[in-house]
Amino acid sequence: MGVLESEEKVVDIPKHTSKLSAIVDFYLHSNNFRSLSAKSQKDYEKHLDVILKTNVEGRLLGNYTVRSIKARHTNLAYEKWLVSGVRTANYRKAVLSAAWKYSMRLDVMDNDPVRLIKTKSTKPRKVKWTRDQVLCFLDTAYGNFKWRSIGLIVHMAYEFAQRVGDMRILTWDNINFSEQRVDLTQSKRGADVHLPIPDDLLSMLRQQSQDFG
C-alpha cells in the first residue's frame, strides 16, 4: 500500500472502499494542503469538518464510502449548506472538490460527484472605485496625520493590485527600501510576490518609517 509521509504522521493512500472522512484526512496531510496560507488552511479545516458532519439521508456525509457516494448525496448536502448562504455553500463545494480531486489524481476513484453539484450564482459584492475616488480618499487620509496609516494601506493595495488585508499585515521587513521593492506572501494563494514601489509611495513609506518605524 502506498503512503504519504507527513511530519505529524504517515497517511495511507485511501482505497475506493474508504470513507469520505479518510479522503479528507489524506488531503489535510498532503503537500497541496500545506502549500496553502495559514489562514486558508484554517478555513479549509473548519469547512471540511462541517462537510463531513452534514447529515444526508440519515448518515453523515463523512461516513459514506468513496464508491457509494453519488451526485445525489453531494447535491443534497449542498442544499443544506445553502442555509449558511450561497457564498458559504459554494466555498464548501470548492474545498471538498480540492480534497476529492487530490485522491482522484492518484486513481483512488474515477468519478466526481462533487463536480456534479448544481451551484447557485452569487451577486457580485465588490464595489469598484474609480481612480478619482481613490485619489480623493488618499488626499483625505494623507491630509490628517491620524489617518495616514489607513491611507498607506489603501495606497499600497491600489498601486500593487493586492488585497487590502495583505497590505494591512505588512511589516517593515517586507519593505526593501534599497531595492525599492515590497516582498510579500499572498494570504489567499500562498504565492510569494515581489513588487516595485513607485517613487511617490516610496516617499510616503520612508516618512512613515521615520515617524513610527
Which residues does each predicted region cover?
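Basic, Lys/Arg- and aromatic-enriched nucleic-acid-binding interface segment
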Residues: 90-92, 105, 109-164, 168, ...
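A structural signal for short hydrophobic/aromatic patches embedded in well-ordered alpha helices
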Residues: 44, 77, 137-138, 205-206
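N-terminal core-binding DNA-recognition domain of tyrosine recombinases/integrases
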Residues: 2-14, 25-39, 49-125, 138-143
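Hydrophobic residues embedded in beta-strands of well-ordered beta-sheets
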Residues: 180-182
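A short, basic/aromatic helix-end/turn motif that makes direct DNA contacts
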Residues: 169-175
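C-terminal catalytic core of Y-nucleophile DNA break-rejoin enzymes
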Residues: 187-207, 213
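Hydrophobic (often cysteine-bearing) scaffold residues that line and stabilize catalytic clefts
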Residues: 16, 20, 40, 44, ...
